[in-house]
Design a protein with these regions (language model features):
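Small-residue-enriched hydrophobic alpha-helices in membranes
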Residues: 1-8, 35-123
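Short terminal alpha-helical segments
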Residues: 4-37
């Protein structure tokens, strides 16, 4: 997988979809939609996991600790710039045990992506 700076146009829809897990909303309502976006992308599940942990999470995790967190979604331009400034591309993935909230959502999302892929294959 290319670094985000070299692959930004293809990453943007993924970044925009994945931000839901750090917004002040019920991400369960969008889980299927996000899984479908991810499944249709060119990225493998392991690449999507790296994007989730090392690109989107470092950019927006602050929001879950905010008293008046963003709930409508970050502006896509702002989000892209923020990710390009703070990403951890190429670094080891964080240990889920130390990040239970993000780990829980990744587990749910990866299961949903697998389900979407399985349904598409058998349709």
């Amino acid at each position: 997988m290319y670094p985000p700076e070299q692959d930004e146009p293809d990453r943007r829809p993924i970044w925009d979809a994945l931000q839901i897990f750090w917004l002040d909303t019920d991400a369960n309502l969008d889980l299927r939609r996000v899984a479908e976006i991810c499944e249709r992308s060119k990225y493998s599940l392991s690449e999507l996991e790296a994007i989730y942990w090392n690109e989107v999470r470092p950019a927006v995790r602050f929001n879950i600790f905010s008293l008046a967190g963003e709930w409508a979604g970050f502006d896509p331009e702002w989000l892209s710039k923020r990710i390009l400034n703070v990403h951890r591309f190429g670094e080891a993935l964080p240990r889920k045990v130390f990040h239970p909230y993000s780990g829980m959502w990744w587990d749910r999302l990866s299961s949903e992506i697998n389900q979407v892929e399985n349904e598409r294959r058998h349709a």
